[in-house]
Amino acid sequence: GRDGADTVKTIRPESLANRLESLTPNPRIVAPGNFATPQTLLKLVDEVLPQYTLHMLNAQGTIPTRDGVTHETTFVGPGMRRSPNLMYYPCRLSLTPVILRQSLPVDVLLLHTSTPRDKMVSMGLEVNILPAVFEAVRDRGGLIIAQVNPKMPHTYGDALVHVDDIDYCIEVDEPLMALEPSPPDEVAQAIAGRIYSRIPDGATLQLGIGGVPDAVLGALTGRRGLRIWSEMFSDGVLALHELGCFDTDVPLTASFVFGSQRLYDWLDGNRLVRMRRTEVTNDPGRISRTPAMISVNSALQVDLYGQANASRIKGRIYSGFGGSTDFIVGALHSPGGNAFIALPSWHPRAQVSTIVPLIEGPVTSFQHSSVVTEYGLAQIFGNEEREQVRQLIEHAAHPDAREALWEAAKAQGRA
């Protein structure tokens, strides 16, 4: 059962403000990102500190943005995309804890937790890099502050924190950001249909963020004995669970979750789901030892060298490496594993092909098993480079783009 929140050392916001004022000038503050943003704490910090650095992964919604606030991240979310004071550190998700330990010393960790059960609160939807930061802040003698929220689901694994290990808590009753699942469009369904046949019963799945990975999950209703080992999941996992598609002897493992309120209600107190820290979920060695590891990630562009851009638009940083590179490497080494890059063949708003001769900006990932669009599956891994080009043009590219792509391939001396 639940203990009352009176087992937490609560502090009045005014007293916390006094404590924050005594911090060293321009402190570095880490807060949960994704859908676990601690809005109340961030507002309080922003009112007290004239100048600080705010580090969040995939920041969503409204976060403090003004002169004096530097935004810092290894994965840019919509909350930071237009920030004039953005410091972007290119880094795979599995290595982000290393950067925060070695290069970016943290003064304050903000947490957004559940109410306590048996003297433990839970980080709920967002574990990710937070345990690593927790340890680093402890070692430096920094501050750990939590906002304790009855609406945050109580999840298990590395999400749990003993109440005595938190310096200060404030009590909030704050709605969590939620996202209702939307039905996949025709293009996403077509792509999912091509990947479906490559996913056997008993496979372990990692799916990235976006409509296409969601559609792939939606296509797997006939599979059995599936497992989840992923940095994140959303409502598609709940739908498959309800249809009996998972091996229930093995926990569904992820590092962060976002989705609907219905998903959050299912997560609360659910021991079938195990939240693990980034260094565990995204460890390429661990991923490679998982048989039939299937990784499905999206991209903005793929070029004729099989390189993917999933992080920049017109050279400007849009997201980051994230964990896709960790899983692509791991899945390629997995016995029976596959790493798919899945994307529509045509960018509807820009009216251009997503299969391009050469990516203009930095590469997010390379060496994938296959590139999949609504037109087909291009087998990349194991093919000679000219056959890779042929596969990409004939199987993945939009028919209207193929002639120009063949011309480009000839100019590259690869056709």
Where are these regions (language model features)?
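Conserved alpha/beta enzyme-core scaffold
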Residues: G4-A415
